[in-house]
């Protein structure tokens, strides 16, 4: 059995999406030690306005305790097809391309999980 516990600090407090759908993508990043996370977060928050032209972020967090050098964020989509379209459009965006050319160098690994809200969730 594998168990991971993290204490997260909100960089962008979570906002329940009003009309963007309830298919959520949770992305977790582990940065390289010795400043990689700060460099990645600085680059990511700088490009976020350009990325949000394609879809709005639900929240952005940095790990305070647990696994060091980690950040995570959540995006909402109306469907998996919409997610694929948004990601394809973002990949064509020059600002996002520039971020990827720099930002990926600060990371060791990334995990993506697609989530659906439980019936009792306020994130419906």
Residue ranges of predicted features:
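Short S/T/G/P-rich N-terminal loop/turn motif that feeds into the first structured element of a domain
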Residues: 1-124
């Amino acid at each position: 059995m594998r168990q991971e516990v993290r204490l997260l600090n909100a960089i962008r407090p979570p906002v329940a999406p009003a009309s963007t759908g309830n298919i959520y993508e949770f992305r977790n990043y582990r940065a390289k030690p010795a400043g990689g996370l700060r460099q990645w977060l600085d680059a990511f928050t700088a490009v976020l306005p350009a990325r949000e032209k394609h879809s709005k972020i639900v929240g952005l967090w940095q790990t305070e305790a647990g696994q060091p050098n980690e950040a995570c964020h959540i995006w909402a989509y109306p469907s998996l097809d919409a997610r694929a379209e948004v990601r394809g459009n973002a990949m064509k965006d020059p600002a996002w391309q520039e971020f990827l050319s720099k930002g990926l160098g600060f990371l060791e690994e990334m995990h993506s999980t697609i989530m659906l809200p439980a019936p009792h969730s306020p994130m419906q």
